[in-house]
Amino acid sequence: MNLPFLELPQLLPRVLDWVEAEQKRALDQGTALSPAALDDARAAGVRMPESIRVCAVPEIPQPGHPKIKQLAAELGLITPQTIAMTFGFGIFVRTGRASDRETLVHECVHVAQYEELGVEGFLMQYVVQIFKNGYDNAPMEREAREAALRIVNQ
């Protein structure tokens, strides 16, 4: 086990602060979903899709705290290849991918998961799943991938 994962309970307040700050930034600076994307978000299980904002960015936001940054890197959460990341109702998507339907639906599934579990519940479950199963096999990631494919291919 890596040290940052073992320190997650102590780091959680800082992680929550970071997630809340990034969500606020996305809500302040992002754009609302189009009517078609609102329909997709509803199909993905989002109860309040009108609250979602999407921010196109050159790169996905990184945590400022070194141990949180290390944990995110070790779990594969934020890599140079990361296309998008959801912070509550805020979705950050790399510039050029913000109109990619499958990516947005995938992230909307994560919004629905945040709605269901709350920020702390989402983060704890998500990180534990990735630690135990790896990023690609984490149940929350599989759910998002499968739902995105199903919705896009309807």
Q: Whereabouts are the PLM-identified features?
A:
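Metalloprotease/metallohydrolase-associated module, dominated by Zn2+-dependent proteases
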Residues: 5-50, 56-58, 63, 67-86, ...
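Short alpha-helix carrying the canonical HExxH Zn2+-binding catalytic motif
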Residues: 97-113
